[in-house]
Structures are given as structure tokens and as C-alpha cells.
């Protein structure tokens, strides 16, 4: 288990995050409060990992109460599981943001550490996943990722992994360009969601690059 120092939520910090992701009062801001914890266990000598080969696999957020400027919070984390896969390892990390002894936000992150030989072999293609026919969406919106968004997001989020900010490094680990932070992809995609949402869960299936266009489609299910 890992405990981070108490964090005061500066309103300018929240505003900077919102401006970068283009969403006032972004639901995803709490992810920025746990970055010190990630830095802590990544540097733990008992946990050996090549951060340069890490990508975000899945993210869950559960909201118990809203955060406000000048809140003093205490982030906590624990490693829930480490799974070995043919193409690498998955690290499952649970996190909690505490305020006055109460859980305000729960998070769960599944991080995928790509193996050294995870690229498809020549002529090898992954089978496409079947599309689910949901009918026409109730609404949709599109955003084109600016060239400098990975760099700008690295500031307020604290996610400055060089695969997001250093082109040469990104190429050295197999990407053709820097890639957008998974949590930035999540924040941009979640921009039209209601602020009283109780839970959000996402799965990242492929990297998002500067210049890509993200389209968020929403289907109402009657609930």
C-alpha cells in the first residue's frame, strides 16, 4: 500500500486542467491527485518496470462526493494484482482520494507493460471485434487532437512519461509519434457527460495520436 502527502486543490490547478481538456469542471480532474503515488511505486525497488513501455489499458472512476477548490485531500493506493500475459504484464492499481477521513473518489487503473516483442509478426492480423448494433446514437461530438495536447496535458496532470512528450523516445519504444495520455483521451471524450455522474469506466483499445479525431457517441438506455 502507498500513501501520498496531503494535497491542497488549488483552484488555478483545476482551471488549468479544465482548459487543457476543454471541459469546465472536468469529472476526470481527480486523476491528477494520485500522480505522486504512481511515481512512488514506480520507483519502489521491489517493483521493477520499464515505464517507457507502459500504456493505459482501462480506467474506472467512482464518485462519492464532489471535490471543490481548496479541499485538502489524502491520496491512497495499493497494487491489487499483477497479471502475466503473452504480450506483457498488466498492473492493476486501486486508488482512493480521502477528505476528512471519507472516500471522495475511488479509482482503479489497469496499466499494460508491453513486452519487448509485442509487435504483430509480418502477415499477422488481429481479428476485428464484432460491432454491436445499438442503432443511431442520441448524440455525438468530435474533437481533433491538437499537436501539442500531450505536452500541455502533462503539466496539470503530472503525466510526463516521455512517450507523451519526447518524439525520439516514443519512436524508440515502437510508436510513430508521441501518443496522447490515456486519461487525457478519457477527459476529452467525457466532456459532454453530466456532472452528477456516479461512475465511469473506459477501456483503451489503441493509441491516440496528435491529429487524430475522437468521436464520442452517446446512446440513451432509459435509465
For each of these PLM feature ranges, what is it?
Residues 25, 87-89, 196-200:
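Short, surface-exposed helix-loop/turn micro-motifs enriched in polar/charged residues
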